Amino acid sequence: EHVKGRIGMTFIHGTGMDHTVWTLAGRHFARRDLNILAVDLPAHGHSDGDLIPSIEGMADWVIKAMDAAGQEQSIIVGHSMGSLVAFDVAARYPDRITALAMVGTALPMPVGEVLLNSAKEDSPLAKDMINFWSHSQAGHLGGSQVPGTWMIGKLNRLLERAGPGVIHNDLLACAEY
């Protein structure tokens, strides 16, 4: 629920993911009286619509989502692909953003040919590669800072929910930004 006068915080997920990656962070900041908006980009999670093939297009969509949520200004947080989207929002709409946090980012964000081709074929190998490269050695051994959380299993389930073409679209957008 948006409360007028509170600081906004907008979360943008990474490739093939959805808003659920921000559940714990969203709760943390909501308890500190921030207005939380954790988006599902079009064709991700519970969001309808067509895939957006560019980071710039995703950034424009995020601004529309902020408008719909009543967030005139916001702290913006993005993970991986979402960090590029957040960066683009902050660069092109600086009057709307009070702070920027980029998690798991690189600029440029190159994507290997094997990964991109595997994603184009909707091969499970693409999801396996993303999951392998997304976690530390401790994570692969079951280590997690949150008791009872298996991050590799969680990301597996999340990527399995991605619709056809979603991961390829997202990776290609990162590679071309």
List the predicted regions and their residue ranges.
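Structural cue for short, hydrophobic secondary-structure segments
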Residues: 11-14, 38
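A generic "structured core" feature
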Residues: 12, 76-77, 85-88
